[in-house]
Amino acid sequence: MKKVFALVAVCCLAVTAALFTSCNSDQKSSYQYIVALDDTVEQDPAMCMQFELNGLPIIKAEMEKTSDQAGSIIYKDTKANADKRAKDAFASGIAKLREGGIGSYAGLIVVLKGMDNDTNKWNVIDRVTL
């Protein structure tokens, strides 16, 4: 009887460990996003902060409003959720910009980029032509 109880206990521990591992396999990480005016040039975050000088601060401001870190566009979440949060905030900023009228910005390409942690390069997540 003790052997059966021990076997059941070991099996229960193994199942619990497996469930715990699978539940934590998609842990939250920090993902960084920037807004740029050109999707063909590799840009670092410091360069993209000049985006505000180009007269379109509202997009970046909308993204910062939803960011997990003040002053930056960083989401601590799973990759899929972080990309979705960034795209939603980007879309909100574009919508607010359009509400105010895009004027001379018509035809301008605005790009949302996300950092690929594996390659340390910025990848285009979303692109909008005003």
Give a label for each model feature:
Residues 11-12:
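Repetitive helical segments and hydrophobic/amphipathic motifs
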Residues 1-6, 16-43:
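Bacterial Sec-dependent N-terminal signal peptides
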Residues 28-130:
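First exposed extracellular module after export/assembly in secreted or surface-exposed proteins
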